[in-house]
């Protein structure tokens, strides 16, 4: 049973060209905003560093595991922020490493700020198809047993925020790549799907609503993810076969005394092309800010899909550090 499930995951996720959500997924996305939107760089007004590990569908061989490292800070010019994000993503026989440098310029609008950000970097992707047990031993799609790519990357985003509200749109990968490898005869391999890296769009918004002063703050947020929205595919049949659903994460959380944070979220998806929807998971998470500027957190996803039986949920652990850039004195963390 486990081997069958693993093979199914390979078929659905391992093919880098599959027209689906290709970017890494995180339950604690609100602590990893730089990954989705380069305009977030420097928005905390002090340097912030974060490390996050995710194990998805724990208990299934070949299931995704992801690590991210982010760091961002404002410069002496308060309007400029810079950042760095690294992502290591392993799904069965495939391995992807991304590195991006971000630059954001902030424009004051009353008590709010509008940031415009760009990023540039590189994505290294490779696979080892010999780890798969193929139903068809002669498959043109796997003529190259160890394909690899080095892909330059450029992204952009906008981010509007103040002390109580934020809204942003990020496109971390603006360039789309045709990833079809040449066959043994020199021609392009015929596959039932288009081997392509697609453009992803991430829309996020949230608020911080005091319920009892700063002692108790309610913080709702949402992240909407779409892939291939403007890819220029005109064939309805191709859309139906290859179109990834629009996914959304809805999160509701409470923060106590600006230190202890608990939340619950719901992840689902809507397929615009055949009017269907699906429930992916319900999630619980907690985070704590220590007095020395350290932040720790963890999350658990309860799967609602057909993997509910063999998988034992998904897990995330997070470690962060924040400090005041100008005075080097540790400060109370901000809400966003």
Regions picked out by a protein language model, each given a short descriptive name:
Residues 1, 20-21:
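Absolute protein N-terminus
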Residues 1-4, 109-110:
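Positively charged n-region of N-terminal signal peptides that target proteins for export
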Residues 4-5, 221:
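Residue-level detector of intrinsically disordered/flexible regions characterized by low predicted structural confidence
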Residues 5-6, 25:
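Generic early N-terminus positional signal peaking at residue ~5-7
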Residues 7-17:
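Bacterial N-terminal signal peptides
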Residues 21-336:
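Subset of outer-membrane beta-barrel
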